[in-house]
């Protein structure tokens, strides 16, 4: 039953459809087609365009995929939210840099790991820098 339907489509209906298409004999003949002729050609041209795209798609360059979709890959993963609290009065340095990319080996302090992260992912993250006000 199903094969009979497929055979009928391939052997009878498809050839009849293709015979009725207003395909001109030359390239200049396309300019003489009417709007109704173009509308009858539209499904056929759409199928040809789809098949052409599917044929050449494997040769298109692949999109660059991000290597790291998660931000925090390893720091305090047992906690539902990582929070580091630092008292500003306790800063004995005049300047401190804190990590925002989660790649630092000295987290929460920044060790410059964001540079490699930015290079790999195209991101632009940098450290949080705290400075003491000069009086």
Swiss-Prot record:
<keyword id="KW-1000">Mitochondrion outer membrane</keyword>
<dbReference type="GO" id="GO:0051537">
    <property type="term" value="F:2 iron, 2 sulfur cluster binding"/>
</dbReference>
<keyword id="KW-0411">Iron-sulfur</keyword>
<feature type="binding site">
    <location>
        <position position="99"/>
    </location>
    <ligand>
        <name>[2Fe-2S] cluster</name>
    </ligand>
</feature>
<feature type="binding site">
    <location>
        <position position="114"/>
    </location>
    <ligand>
        <name>[2Fe-2S] cluster</name>
    </ligand>
</feature>
<dbReference type="Pfam" id="PF09360">
    <property type="entry name" value="zf-CDGSH"/>
</dbReference>
<feature type="topological domain" description="Cytoplasmic">
    <location>
        <begin position="61"/>
        <end position="135"/>
    </location>
</feature>
<dbReference type="Pfam" id="PF10660">
    <property type="entry name" value="MitoNEET_N"/>
</dbReference>
<dbReference type="GO" id="GO:0042803">
    <property type="term" value="F:protein homodimerization activity"/>
</dbReference>
<keyword id="KW-0256">Endoplasmic reticulum</keyword>
<dbReference type="GO" id="GO:0000422">
    <property type="term" value="P:autophagy of mitochondrion"/>
</dbReference>
<feature type="binding site">
    <location>
        <position position="101"/>
    </location>
    <ligand>
        <name>[2Fe-2S] cluster</name>
    </ligand>
</feature>
<feature type="binding site">
    <location>
        <position position="110"/>
    </location>
    <ligand>
        <name>[2Fe-2S] cluster</name>
    </ligand>
</feature>
<dbReference type="GO" id="GO:0097038">
    <property type="term" value="C:perinuclear endoplasmic reticulum"/>
</dbReference>
<comment type="subunit">
    <text>Homodimer. Interacts with BCL2; the interaction is direct and disrupted by BIK interaction with BCL2. Interacts with BCL2L1. Interacts with ITPR1.</text>
</comment>
<dbReference type="GO" id="GO:0005783">
    <property type="term" value="C:endoplasmic reticulum"/>
</dbReference>
<dbReference type="GO" id="GO:0005789">
    <property type="term" value="C:endoplasmic reticulum membrane"/>
</dbReference>
<feature type="transmembrane region" description="Helical">
    <location>
        <begin position="38"/>
        <end position="60"/>
    </location>
</feature>
<comment type="similarity">
    <text>Belongs to the CISD protein family. CISD2 subfamily.</text>
</comment>
<feature type="topological domain" description="Lumenal">
    <location>
        <begin position="1"/>
        <end position="37"/>
    </location>
</feature>
<keyword id="KW-0072">Autophagy</keyword>
<dbReference type="InterPro" id="IPR019610">
    <property type="entry name" value="FeS-contain_mitoNEET_N"/>
</dbReference>
<keyword id="KW-0812">Transmembrane</keyword>
<comment type="function">
    <text>Regulator of autophagy that contributes to antagonize BECN1-mediated cellular autophagy at the endoplasmic reticulum. Participates in the interaction of BCL2 with BECN1 and is required for BCL2-mediated depression of endoplasmic reticulum Ca(2+) stores during autophagy. Contributes to BIK-initiated autophagy, while it is not involved in BIK-dependent activation of caspases. Involved in life span control, probably via its function as regulator of autophagy.</text>
</comment>
<dbReference type="GO" id="GO:0010506">
    <property type="term" value="P:regulation of autophagy"/>
</dbReference>
<dbReference type="InterPro" id="IPR018967">
    <property type="entry name" value="FeS-contain_CDGSH-typ"/>
</dbReference>
<keyword id="KW-0001">2Fe-2S</keyword>
<dbReference type="GO" id="GO:0048471">
    <property type="term" value="C:perinuclear region of cytoplasm"/>
</dbReference>
<dbReference type="InterPro" id="IPR042216">
    <property type="entry name" value="MitoNEET_CISD"/>
</dbReference>
<keyword id="KW-0479">Metal-binding</keyword>
<dbReference type="GO" id="GO:0032991">
    <property type="term" value="C:protein-containing complex"/>
</dbReference>
<keyword id="KW-0408">Iron</keyword>
<keyword id="KW-1133">Transmembrane helix</keyword>
<keyword id="KW-0472">Membrane</keyword>
<dbReference type="GO" id="GO:0005741">
    <property type="term" value="C:mitochondrial outer membrane"/>
</dbReference>
<keyword id="KW-0496">Mitochondrion</keyword>
<protein>
    <recommendedName>
        <fullName>CDGSH iron-sulfur domain-containing protein 2</fullName>
    </recommendedName>
</protein>
<dbReference type="GO" id="GO:0046872">
    <property type="term" value="F:metal ion binding"/>
</dbReference>
<dbReference type="InterPro" id="IPR045131">
    <property type="entry name" value="CISD1/2"/>
</dbReference>
């Amino acid at each position: 039953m199903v094969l009979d339907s497929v055979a009928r489509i391939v052997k009878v209906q498809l050839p009849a459809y293709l015979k009725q298409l207003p395909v001109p004999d030359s390239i200049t003949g396309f300019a003489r087609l009417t709007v109704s002729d173009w509308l009858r050609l539209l499904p056929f041209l759409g199928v040809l365009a789809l098949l052409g795209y599917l044929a050449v798609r494997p040769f298109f360059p692949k999109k660059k995929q991000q290597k790291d979709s998660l931000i925090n890959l390893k720091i305090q993963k047992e906690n539902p939210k990582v929070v580091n609290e630092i008292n500003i009065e306790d800063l004995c340095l005049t300047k401190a840099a804190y990590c925002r990319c989660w790649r630092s080996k000295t987290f929460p302090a920044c060790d410059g790991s964001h540079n490699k992260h930015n290079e790999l992912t195209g991101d632009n993250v940098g450290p949080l820098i705290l400075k003491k006000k000069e009086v």
